[in-house]
Amino acid sequence: VPASDFPTPVSELAAGEQLFEEMELGGIVNFIAFRQAVAGYNRIKEKSKPILTLIDFSKPSTEKRFFVFDMEKKQLLYSSVVSHGRNSGENYATSFSNQNGSYKSSLGFYLTENTYQGGNGYSLILNGLEKGINDKAKERSIVVHGASYANPTVAASGRLGRSLGCPALPTKLAKPIINTIKDG
């Protein structure tokens, strides 16, 4: 369900702000993106573990914009750079799609599923929850995986390399992050 379909209650906004302060995320995570992610997380009934992953596409690919939170322990577990789809933009992702062959990233809320060993190594299947926004993620083979072009040393050239639409992580972080967020 798109977050914009339901007005966010004032109590939920206050809870998001309190959580942001409690987790000491100022200067690390964009407050508006965090608040929106928490509101969506709280509406997802099917989740099976207290892990929230946020990709803040308002930031450039050269900055840490992939965040993993333990919502029970109220901790930031990981922060990393992450690649976006090659047709979503250069350093900033500005264009998004749910269409197969678009090579663009998709917005919205997902549930993580199981892992597999594929062409990009250890990978995590994503199930898009928002009709018309990201519900074709599986059909498009949009998965979380590691990639050499997503390593911070590549960012020194002005941007990370780009994927075919997948959120690609630095190779060294991919497996521990995937193991933390899978089956959620």
What do these predicted ranges mean?
Residues 2-164, 172-184:
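Cell wall/extracellular polymer interaction/catalysis modules
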